[in-house]
Swiss-Prot record:
It is a multi-pass membrane protein. Keywords: Abscisic acid signaling pathway, Flowering, Membrane, Nucleus, Transmembrane, Transmembrane helix. The gene is SHW1. The chain crosses the membrane at residues 122-142, 159-179. This is Protein SHORT HYPOCOTYL IN WHITE LIGHT 1. Residues 77-92 have a biased composition (Acidic residues). The lineage of its organism: Eukaryota, Viridiplantae, Streptophyta, Embryophyta, Tracheophyta. Interacts with HY5 and COP1 in the nucleus. A motif (Nuclear localization signal) lies at residues 43-50. Disruption phenotype: Short hypocotyl in dark with drastic reduction in apical hook curvature. Enhanced inhibition in hypocotyl elongation in white light (WL), especially at lower fluence rates. Delayed flowering under long-day conditions. Reduced lateral roots formation. Reduced chlorophyll accumulation and expression of light-regulated genes. Increase in the anthocyanin level in the dark. Reduced sensitivity to abscisic acid (ABA) leading to impaired ABA-mediated reduction of seed germination. The double mutant shw1 phyB exhibits a strongly reduced hypocotyl length in WL. It comes from Arabidopsis thaliana (Mouse-ear cress).
Amino acid sequence: MAAATTTLSSSSSSPSLTLINASHRFVSVTPFSSNSIFLRRRFRRLNRSLASSSSHSRRRYESDDRFFGGGDNYDVVPDDDGFSDDDDEEDERESSVDLLIRFLRSMFKKVSKRTKKASRRILPAAMSPRLVSFAVDGILLLGSLSITRAFLEVICNLGGTVFTVILLIRLFWAAASFFQTYGNSFGPNPVN
């Protein structure tokens, strides 16, 4: 099987490149020139990005199958028992919680990775990477817990304030309705 070849040259000073149609790769006549290394790196990046985008799309469809139970479990006729709406809402809640947990994990991993790199630059090389990783993860967990605690304190304080305001409004409402109903009947009656 003979492959058709085409020779490309961009200028007279650069080495010629050969495109082999069977493999769709550029092959340089001088294998270790700067242009050939640059082209190889560029095509590798292009191939990696194409491969990663196709794997992402495959993962997306696989995760959809996991959430929806595969293609063979779809019901054509709706259920008559009346519980299907509740089940769908419960599945929706579970999937949204699952997505939230996945998002938080990915954010934690990204922040942890950046923090580990920054701390390794600052700390001496004698410290083990496992110790640095443990310390960074612990500090990030404690920080996220303290932020969560502060957020919950704010929510609880707002809830307590709203509850107190509602009680005061009900107290004033009850007092106003009492005075409207009975008037001044509980005090001394003036002589007519």
